[in-house]
């Protein structure tokens, strides 16, 4: 099922955490959940050019703290902080509470799955060939340290009469390995022929390196290969790693 499920939801509580971090009783939960949805929809619509990777919402006692992860924080802050102050006031009106707004810069947008998907969507809307856009994104991600990346584009690609799905992968993307740090993002391209959907998976390495069970398992795998193969520097069987 690791191939089908959302990789981020699959790893919540293991090596990922939630984007909404607050607690509410039954009476308040629905109202606060809809507030979160409205805040995210508003920010993504208003700050489309700022490259929003994710929005984290925390709710300390009778307050709201919103953290925006952006590839271009200067567009959000504005000249002398004027734009960010307007944004903070708007969010305060939406939540009816004191709102703190934090901006975090995404240092490497080329290996952020959501930003990669948004970039491909923008290229498709400008009529760039989908294969060229996918291959360029894959090469940039691998150059900047990703261990693997997979991209799928679905829809009337190139204006074809029949919709189809094309995908491109480079490196390893072990979706069923829970210790793997896999980022996942989606975007939609509104082309002249209809909407095309883009999905991106990026494998950044294994997070639970300190896990004693993982270390012991790797040691057993090394012993199973025998000393001759280790002396030659043979690479371990990829199928065994993904098992």
Curated annotation (Swiss-Prot):
Residues 214-243 are annotated as: Disordered. InterPro entries: KH_dom (IPR004087), KH_dom-like_a/b (IPR015946), KH_dom_type_2 (IPR004044), KH_sf_prok-type (IPR009019), Ribosomal_S3_C_sf (IPR036419), Ribosomal_uS3_bac-typ (IPR005704), Ribosomal_uS3_C (IPR001351), Ribosomal_uS3_CS (IPR018280). Residues 229-243 have a biased composition (Basic and acidic residues). One of its GO terms (molecular function) is structural constituent of ribosome. The keyword RNA-binding applies. Residues 39-107 form the KH type-2 domain. Keywords: Ribonucleoprotein, Ribosomal protein, RNA-binding, rRNA-binding. One of its GO terms (cellular component) is cytosolic small ribosomal subunit. The keyword rRNA-binding applies. Binds the lower part of the 30S subunit head. Binds mRNA in the 70S ribosome, positioning it for translation. NCBIfam families: rpsC_bact. Part of the 30S ribosomal subunit. Forms a tight complex with proteins S10 and S14. This is Small ribosomal subunit protein uS3. It comes from Agrobacterium fabrum (strain C58 / ATCC 33970) (Agrobacterium tumefaciens (strain C58)). The lineage of its organism: Bacteria, Pseudomonadati, Pseudomonadota, Alphaproteobacteria, Hyphomicrobiales.
């Amino acid at each position: 099922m690791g191939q089908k499920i959302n990789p981020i939801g699959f790893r919540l509580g293991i090596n990922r955490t939630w984007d909404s971090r607050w607690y509410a009783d039954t009476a308040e939960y629905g109202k606060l959940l809809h507030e979160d949805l409205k805040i995210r929809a508003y920010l993504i619509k208003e700050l489309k050019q700022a490259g929003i990777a994710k929005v984290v919402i925390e709710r300390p006692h009778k307050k709201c703290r919103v953290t925006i992860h952006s590839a271009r924080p200067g567009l959000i802050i504005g000249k002398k902080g004027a734009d960010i102050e307007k944004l903070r006031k708007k969010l305060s009106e939406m939540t009816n509470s004191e709102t703190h707004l934090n901006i975090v810069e995404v240092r490497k947008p080329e290996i952020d799955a959501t930003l990669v998907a948004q970039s491909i969507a923008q290229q498709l809307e400008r009529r760039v060939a989908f294969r060229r856009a996918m291959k360029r994104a894959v090469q940039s991600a691998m150059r900047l340290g990703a261990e693997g990346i997979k991209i799928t584009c679905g829809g009337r690609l190139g204006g074809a009469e029949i919709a189809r799905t094309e995908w491109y992968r480079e490196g390893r993307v072990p979706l069923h390995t829970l210790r793997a740090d896999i980022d996942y993002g989606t975007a939609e391209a509104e082309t002249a022929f209809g909407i095309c959907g883009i999905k991106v998976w990026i494998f950044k390495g294994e997070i639970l390196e300190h896990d004693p069970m993982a270390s012991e398992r790797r040691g057993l795998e090394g012993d199973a290969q025998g000393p001759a193969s280790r002396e030659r520097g043979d690479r371990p069987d990829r199928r065994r790693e993904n098992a």
